[in-house]
């Protein structure tokens, strides 16, 4: 957590300066790898249907999952049959694997399970995205567009459209590549992208801004929708890429927090994690709720979040998809 906080400060922390040689090695390796794919020296899989990659150039939360959910739901409304592929971080395997709504987060991964339940779309997970795309084609021949969650740097899978998410609040941090900074690829990558989309405000590189808004509240133990009594005091936990955003959102909604506790992204929650938080009702994200349902109390609640796609973005994206579908790939 300390390291991530330092990454998103404007100046390079003196201790992080010691990591800059490793960042240069990271830059060399990733650029060579990308060049090999671009030159055809490493094989790439081309799916029979258009592939939309939703990714980012930095680590940490940039709103990819809400974007994938919103994109999938909108495409279904437009008559498309989207399928989602993802890495399945934390999933047990074997891979590739098609996620079922009845799966546990331990089996399928927290984010793929959330996307499966929220969208109703088929979801296939595999560390190698090309394998996931192949299984999707085999199991779901009616799928006519594949949405690849967090696959920007997975060049073994050819893509037709890239949607790069950027957090307008934190931007590109100190501008350094891993491990001295938060970047998987340099800011130059944004200039060559089809679509750069910011959330939580405008960013200089972004063509479109997506509003991410808090949704409804539900009980963690049974998913029953509730009206939260905001006059109470609450404790909050978050095991996501940027926990402070969740806590800030609660405060902006007029919710009084007595305690807030951050955990690492994809944290595997246990009942012991809440031993010091039992004095008040507990609030958490939808992503974390799935991992706490088996031991949740009746006064534990989670909130959904909704990404609102701009109309001009929908129009342009639909036109581009139709063009790709008609053979311009």
From Swiss-Prot:
Residues binding ATP, per UniProt: 58-65
SUPFAM superfamilies for this protein: P-loop containing nucleoside triphosphate hydrolases
Record key words, sorted: ATP-binding, Kinase, Lipid A biosynthesis, Lipid biosynthesis, Lipid metabolism, Nucleotide-binding, Transferase
Record-linked Pfam families: LpxK (PF02606)
InterPro entries: LpxK, P-loop_NTPase
Similarity comment: family membership: Belongs to the LpxK family.
Protein name, entry field: Tetraacyldisaccharide 4'-kinase
Upper lineage: Bacteria, Pseudomonadati, Pseudomonadota, Gammaproteobacteria, Alteromonadales
